[in-house]
Amino acid sequence: QRLPRIGGMTGTAHEARLELGKVYGLGITRVPTHQITRRKNLGCRVFENKDEKLRVIVEDVKKLSLNGHAILIGLKSVLTSQEVASAFDKYAEDLPIEILNAVNNAEENSIVARAGQCGAVTVATNMAGRGTDIKISQSVRDTGGLHVIIAETNDFSRIDRQLIGRCARQGDPGTCIRYVALNEDVVVRFLPKILQKL
């Protein structure tokens, strides 16, 4: 209220439009992207538990990496990024991965620079979701672009969309997919009790 004019730009304002209107008295306008998106959303895979989900993620990532894709795996916290790293140690110890979280954020620029290279596997917390521009190599572009995995659903869909927005930027191709376990916290909190018993 102290500012005569306020404005901003983001790819995820639509989800927050009610809050922006109610709290700040602001409206939003959708602006079409400069280039048509080439992103392919591969949907959602659902698993009975987190252990099964992590095992399949590692198996899928190993295949994608061997085929020349660059993969970004997004998670909510340092703890879960370490759990995913442990799953790679268990099921694919020969596959090198990079971890980008608050513990090693000093290395962020160099990790991001390598994340778009052929076969790269980057495990990252939400710090990689907003504003990070992963440049992909021509060989990755030729294999379909950056592949983003939402390995842990966030409480707010806007954060997941920010992560998805790391792929298929500026006319590049890219793919995204979500992996969900029925026993992870966000599912347990929001899934109706009757469905949890199925």
Predicted regions and their residues:
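A contiguous, basic/glycine-rich beta-loop/short-helix subdomain that forms a polymer-engagement track
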Residues: Q1-I57, A102, S110-R114, T132, ...
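Conserved nucleotide-binding/hydrolysis micro-motifs of P-loop NTPases
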Residues: R5-I6, A13-E15, H34-R38, S77-T80, ...
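Structural recognition of the conserved hydrophobic beta-strand(s) that form the central parallel beta-sheet
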Residues: I6-M9, V121-T125, V148-A151
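Residue-level signature of catalytic and energy-coupling elements of molecular machines
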Residues: T10, I73, V123, G165
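Short, exposed interaction patches on small structured surface elements
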Residues: G25-C44, I177-L198
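Structural motif
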Residues: L26-T29, I71, A120-T122, L146-V148, ...
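Conserved motor-coupling elements within RecA-like helicase/translocase cores
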Residues: K63-G68, V78-L146
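Conserved SF2 helicase motif VI
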Residues: I136-S139, G145-I149, T153-I177, L191-K197
